[in-house]
Amino acid sequence: MKQYQSYKCNKCGNVVEVQNVGGGELHCCGQAMEMITKDLTSVVLMKAFAGESMARNKYEYFAKIAQKEGFRDIAEHFQRAANNEKMHAKLELKAYNVLNYDKEFGNTSENLQYAIDGESYENVTMYPEFAKVAKEEGHADIARLLDMIGKIEIEHENMYKSLKHRLDSGKEHVSDEEEEWICEVCGHVHRGKKALKVCPVCKHPIEYQSRLNSKK
């Protein structure tokens, strides 16, 4: 038995993660639980990734507080550390992906699907369950907050679905109807069913032309 290994009850489906290693076996429903962790390195990489990601966000919040309080040097230290944590998280996620999928990151279509799945889990399962816990413990304001955030995740899921459909159908820079396309570099606006291959003003290529209505 090792710390962070997960064990499952084959009768009720209960899963527990080992925090403190002791002797003997883990039991549930009158029987020994089965160890289901196949690769502990993957588990600790994801824990490290989560920890570094949280630290990065916290340090950025702390940097803004220090900035408001007039401690500019401390703010810079917080921000520098936040940037370091971001890189640590990236390295850990890349290592996890290589270990499990033989590549550092997926392509954009695959990443959009990953985002869709994540947002779906958040709005269907995670936030409703978290809001229920807060409500049961008498934290009505927190329950409402979690519920409202969960509804926002529905919009995120729909946004990613729309983007993936557009990308997969080859219409990232093509539309069935006339639209306004804006150059993200100089702001030139063109109306038509296709984005311009090259901006006539600043000469940036089609990659810098996007739908104006998606920016509003």
Per-range role (PLM):
Residues 5-7, 15, 27-34:
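N-terminal alpha-helical targeting/anchoring segments
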Residues 1-4, 38-40:
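Extreme N-terminus of proteins, especially the signal/transit-peptide cleavage junction
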Residues 1, 9-11, 19-20:
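Short solvent-exposed loop/turn micro-motifs enriched in small/polar/acidic residues
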Residues 15, 19-21, 34-216:
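Non-heme di-metal
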Residues 10, 26-29, 184, 200:
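Cys/His/Pro-rich metal-binding microdomains
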